[in-house]
Amino acid sequence: MFFAGPSVALTSPRAPPEPPPTLLAVAGSHRCAASGELTGGSFSQGVVLAAGVRGVVVDKELIDQLVEVAQRVVASGAISANGHGNVSLRVPGAHEMYFTAGPSLRNHAPSAVVRLGLDGTLLEGDLPPIQGAVVAMHTAMYEDHPDVGCVLHTHSPYATAYAVAHRPIGCWVEALAMFGLPTGVPVAEYGPRGSEQAVGNIRAATIPGVPAVLLANHGVLVFHRTPELAIQVGSIVEEAAQAGINAGSIGGPVEIPEELRVAAFQRAMVFESRGTAHA
């Protein structure tokens, strides 16, 4: 269960039912076939190519939604200059995901979407080994958090600076308290990309109810109920990191007192409950 936060003025996706749904991911410029046969065998770290999969029906609505999510991530600005990162979405009613398998979230297309089971099995599309290596941290978040509907990973510059310094982001920006990160953003210890050690470190660092974690020497991972909330939290984390670094030149950032973080969150909920005011 995540801390609730003020709603966003975007269309919410279908709520993921039980059992945990499938994931969607955009794959940069790689092909995603709508039919055909895939042969068995090992594919990459944590990913196994399904044997004999024919004519898999791909959910076009979810693929289009995932492409839009990737576009929104890029538009948010909370991303590195080269656009490196990946996004995934649960697929309602299936223990699977669609995943962005390309090297960049920029200039992607529906044909770049791949489909995987939450056990890491590749069901549809082409998944390069370097992207396949990060699948495990996406599936881990879905397995550990049944209410998560979207996982977002980027190398946004300021948040990554904290990750490289192995320093958590403190709750010195009010928006962190308002959107479910009153503890700030923790740091997961480094582990080689896609390894069991890396995934284990992420799980160990995750704070219950807090939908983000920094990945030491790597980047940032955000996981939330909806894509809209994941994008919003990703942007807030990057803004807080930038503010912290800028404040370092004038004495350093000052965290909000713990009791006032709770008050800031509760106040946000009061205004949320009132809805939009009209003159």
Protein language model features and the residues they cover:
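Aromatic (phenylalanine/tyrosine) cluster motif
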Residues: 2-3, 43
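Positively charged N-terminal leader segments that act as targeting/secretion signals
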Residues: 15-16, 40
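N-terminal amphipathic/hydrophobic targeting modules at extreme N-termini
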Residues: 35, 39-41
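Glycine-rich flexible loops
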Residues: 50-279
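Leucine-biased recognition of intrinsically disordered, low-complexity hydrophobic segments
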Residues: 10, 23-24, 38, 49
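Compositionally biased, intrinsically disordered low-complexity segments enriched in Pro/Arg/Gln/His
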Residues: 17-21
